[in-house]
Structure formats: C-alpha cells, structure tokens
Amino acid sequence: MNTILELHNLKKYFATQKAVDDISFDIQQGDIFGLLGPNGAGKTTLIRMITGIFYPDSGSILFEGKKFDPINDARHIGYMPEERGLYRKMKIGEQALYLAQLKGMSRHEAMQKVKLWFEKFEMQTWWHKRVEDLSKGMSQKLQFVTTVLHEPKLIILDEPFSGLDPVNANLIKDEIFRLAKNGSTIIFSTHRMEQVEEICDHIALVNKGKKILDGTVKNIKHTFKENHYQIGVAVLPEHLMTHIFKVISAQSDSLLVQLFEDTRTNDVLRYFINKNIDVYSFKEVLPSLSDIFIKLVNGSPEARQFLSINHNHE
C-alpha cells in the first residue's frame, strides 16, 4: 500500500501559542484515518496546513512522496470544513457546478457528476433552491457532495455527521466506505469516539497541539487492554471472593471481571465449573478509545470535557 500523505515534525504558532507542536504521522492510500481530539486540540490547524490554507512554521508535508504544492496538489483534495463554506444566496445546482469547476472540471463533466450525486442522495428537486432555505441536515448533504464530486485522492471531513438524522448519517457513512474501497483516502476529524471506532482503520489522537498516539484502532485497543472479561452465567455465585479475578460489576446473569496478572482464562472457567455454575458466554472487553484518552491525559480538564461529550452520545 502506498503512502499518500506524510507529516514530518509540523509546528504552527499563533503569536506565542503553539497550535501544533511537532506532529508527525503517515497516512496510507485507501485508509479511513481518524484525527481525534477535543476542541482546541489543534485538529483544525493541522487540517489547514494539509490543505495549504496555512503554512507550517517548521516541518514538512509530502503528498504522494513529493513536497506538498498548495496550488497544484490542492486540486486533488476535497475538504469539508466544520464551519460550512456554502454561498447562502446561491442556488444549489449552480453552486455545485461552480465548486466542481473550481476544482478543474469542465462544465459538461461537472453537470454529469452533479446530476449523478443529486440522484444518489435524492436531491434532484433541490436544484433551484437556495442554500439559506435548506435545513442543517440538507446543507450537510450538499456540502458532502460538493466535497467529493471531483473525485479527489484525499478527502478531509471535519465533523461530517453533525446535524444529520440516522438515515442520512448512514447514507454518508456508506459513501465513505465506498470511496475508500475505490481508492480515495479519507481523513475523518472528530471528537466523537464511537464514530471513529466504527469507521476508521487508523487514528491519531492529539491534545494541546501534541500527538498523544497513533496507530490502528485494533492495535491501540490491544495495547491498553486491562484483562477485562464479560462472563455470562446461569446464576451468580453466592460468594465471589477469589484470588484469580476482581469483580468490577455484577448483574443477575453476568459479571464484568478483571483477571489478575497470572490468571489464565481456563482458571476462570474452572472456577465456575467447580461451583457447578453454567457459563454461556465469555468475552474479552477491550477499552474504548474514550477510556484510553482519559487514561493518557490523566484526568485533565480536556479529559473531562471529552468524557462528557462522548458519554452523552452513547
């Protein structure tokens, strides 16, 4: 797999404040890459450097193995910012055509693509409406279409599901998977952990302008696992005092336990067999990305903010 984007030791200052502080990571072609962090973490500044809106104060960006050229390479990038960039007084069909032509498409080619996407998203009747007449969710769908219709190699989506109902959120999600399958690379910037776990292959977690970690979602969760297991049982044993695991929580037919360091899973199963208790499920529980973030930043205000946001959406 080819590396499409490389960030090397990027730094960006605003006056004396470090918005991005020595961040490096690579993104592979066809990946769905999650860029995570609380508000003010540096995500938007990082994205604006990747798209050529800002220049880094130091460090380098390589696009397809060459030094990033903001003028020429930007045409291969589709960017959907969190603060939506649509012209409110302009008619929707003309706006989509105009934005496609800005990315180098002929009007004829743009017309074909816009009609295709409008039909796919059931937007055909919107053509003569103005953006100011659209709901937030409708504006979101239009912004997504104008971001991807020129078939960019790199697609950057900043909070793309904001304001969408579940049906349209799933529609966008399916398109993200399809675009990645067809070779587009997607950067998904968000503070919503559950969406990242569902969608992304790789992630980078940033806080206060610094990268805290990056890697595959699977590897990160396995790195931070704590020997937690969910055990489904026919009945709870009367006494749960044991030297092989600690009970974290108990319900009428299940236990969440943490195995002690030298305990094997067979030891746990043997414990219940000896008590004549049937075990009907036994599953390792990996930490959520939200749990990992909280652990890494160790109870900071950013961690509390992140915890509140993500628990409110669970």
Model feature map: region roles:
Residues K173-F260:
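ABC transporter nucleotide-binding domain
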Residues M1-K11, G299-E314:
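ABC-family P-loop ATPase nucleotide-binding domain
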Residues R107, V217, D262-T265:
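Residues at or immediately preceding the N-termini of alpha-helices
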Residues Q95, S139, V235-E238, R304-E314:
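Short, basic, helix/turn surface patches
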Residues N227-S300:
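Short, charged/small-residue-rich alpha-helical element at the C-terminal edge
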Residues N2-L5, K12-N207, L213:
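ABC transporter nucleotide-binding domains
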